């Protein structure tokens, strides 16, 4: 009974890990084992189509978006967008893939799926959904969530969300995810029957744990700072890109004025008419090309936005760890308090001021039978508290191991995806500049022939 309670911070750390960003053989092996569970041909962290057996067996696509009108829970008419999810077998028949399932889902159902995954897989960096309303838009881009271009970009984002889940070695095996792809009727009821809402941590409790935890894990504190920095950098990049798009759009459209001037000028010139007409045509082509260019840019902006929203998924893992750490510290504190009470009853000495000590002085000592009964109750509570503390320690260790394995997987994915997106964006900018040079070269030749 006199044994000091174990240090919850030491118990919550199963083994020393490398700093953020450093490779760790043990964690890599853990990721590999999880991947092996998803399929014999699974190969750990790789591209989406090589992560597990799911995407080797079926193709998942959100192939169509449709505007619909219906009644909501308040029996009020509303307009919404439904998305057609198709799954096809990769095993071809007569040279064509076989359509296995096809159903329509609303955006709110995608949100329900993600909320469920967040509760049941708190140690996993759950893929984010695309934005519900347009953010970081430049002035010519519509912010209306029913705009066809925005709906199309969101359709692509929702397809990417499903592919992210299907490529994850753990999430891909979830039954609710499988039913999301195959069961159109009563799917919401099936999700609600899991009782995931009751298991969700309250925001107030999470906020309380954030400020009251005494021994936070430095790795998760660093991870939280990393997610804040990631969000800040990508937000700044997207804001700058929106301002540049505004300016670039204006520069290109000015060339449309040049084209109109040259065309009108050619009508009053006899010798220079053909050259001016050709130069005006080149200016018009250049001015109209900006629409396709900025449409392509939105594709790369959406890739950046995905990782902007991933930052919140990282913070969700950190919040869960803080909650578990706080619960562990409270359990250790409660156990230490009970041990002290038991020791005071056995020895008859009171170390600190207590209400019980005051009542003893006022109303006299307890009888030996009463004291023995209290000691017995406290000993039972201490045994129960030790078991509870041990259970929380094991749960915490398992959470840290699994969470860190998935964080390392996410960071490799992030580095690969952002590198590819930024390189492709740079190549697109180079191509755009080359086309601009070519237009002015052609215009120069037209002028030189006058």
From Swiss-Prot:
> Could you tell me which SMART domains the record lists for this protein?
PX (SM00312)
Query: What is the membrane topology here?
Result: Peripheral membrane protein
SUPFAM superfamilies tied to this protein: PX domain (SSF64268)
Pfam families with a match to the protein in the record: PX (PF00787)
- Which Gene Ontology CC terms are recorded? cytoplasm; cytoplasmic dynein complex; early endosome; early endosome membrane; membrane; plasma membrane; presynaptic endosome; protein-containing complex
The PX domain extends over 61-187
Q: Which GO terms describe its biological process?
A: endocytic recycling; positive regulation of autophagosome assembly; positive regulation of histamine secretion by mast cell; protein transport
Kindly list the GO molecular function terms attached to this UniProt entry. epidermal growth factor receptor binding; insulin receptor binding; leptin receptor binding; phosphatidylinositol binding; phosphatidylinositol-3-phosphate binding; transferrin receptor binding
- Signal peptide boundaries: none
N-acetylmethionine (modified residue): where?
1
Locate the residues binding a 1,2-diacyl-sn-glycero-3-phospho-(1D-myo-inositol-3-phosphate): 106, 108, 132, 154
| Compartments in which it is found | Early endosome membrane
The record's listing under InterPro entries reads: AH/BAR_dom_sf, PX_dom, PX_dom_sf, PX_SNX4, SNX4, SNX4_BAR
Note down the stretches annotated as region Disordered.
Answer: 1-46
Alphabetically sorted, this entry's keywords are: Acetylation, Endosome, Lipid-binding, Membrane, Phosphoprotein, Protein transport, Transport
Phosphoserine PTM sites in chain numbering: 22
Q: Which family does it belong to?
A: Belongs to the sorting nexin family.
Purpose of the protein: Involved in the regulation of endocytosis and in several stages of intracellular trafficking. Plays a role in recycling endocytosed transferrin receptor and prevent its degradation. Involved in autophagosome assembly by regulating trafficking and recycling of phospholipid scramblase ATG9A.
What is the UniProt domain comment for this protein?
The PX domain binds phosphatidylinositol 3-phosphate which is necessary for peripheral membrane localization.
Assembly, per entry: Heterodimer; heterodimerizes with SNX7 or SNX30. Interacts with WWC1/KIBRA. Identified in a complex with WWC1/KIBRA and dynein components DYNLL1 and DYNC1I2. Interacts with BIN1.
Q: What is this protein called?
A: Sorting nexin-4
Source organism: Homo sapiens (Human)
